[in-house]
Amino acid sequence: MRIILIGFMGVGKTTIGKIIAKKLKLNFVDMDNYIEKREGKSISKIFEEYGEQHFRELESESLKDLIKSDNIVISTGGGIVTTKQNLEILKKEKIVIFLDGNTQTILNHLSKEIDKRPLLSKSNNVENTISNLLNERYEKYNSICDIKIDINEKNIEEVVSQILVNIG
């Protein structure tokens, strides 16, 4: 079994992924952490030194590596859907779960870590930036998911429970 979590930054992919993996006795990999370990640099540093395009290439390479694994829960980065190559890979997967949160929920979740998010840290209007990026990506998330879970006004346990029911 391979479960892939997608959705915007701050929707809880990593937190929820770890819990799902533990409950199902699967391995867990957070793609951003995987990239940081592989590159020996933080995501922020990679963005700063090489730009977003380079990071997206690293993300694609990492996705290709990770989907070779079985018995795993993979938490992707929020921008995984920005490249056509990744969309094609993810469309072929059997269990892609879209954690769907609105702008306000995402803003609430990210409020303490905006400086760690390269696409938000330099923004003059974080709420607007989140809204715009979410609008750009929403249809892509929606088009490749097998299961969509609305996370708005739900606690982690409710989201986990909904996922477990949906994957049977």
Language model features: what each stretch is:
Residues 22-60:
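Conserved substrate/cofactor phosphate-moiety recognition/catalytic segment
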Residues 92-137:
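A glycine- and Lys/Arg-enriched "phosphate-lid" helix/loop adjacent to the NTP-binding pocket
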Residues 14:
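Walker A/P-loop
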Residues 5:
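Hydrophobic anchor at the beta1->P-loop junction of P-loop NTPases
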Residues 19, 23, 107-108, 125, ...:
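NTP-dependent small-molecule kinase module
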Residues 8:
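P-loop (Walker A) phosphate-binding loop of NTP-binding proteins
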Residues 54-93, 99, 103, 152:
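Glycine-rich phosphate-binding loop used to anchor ATP phosphates in small-molecule kinases
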Residues 29, 95-97, 147-149:
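Hydrophobic/aromatic beta-strand patches that form the interior of the parallel beta-sheet core
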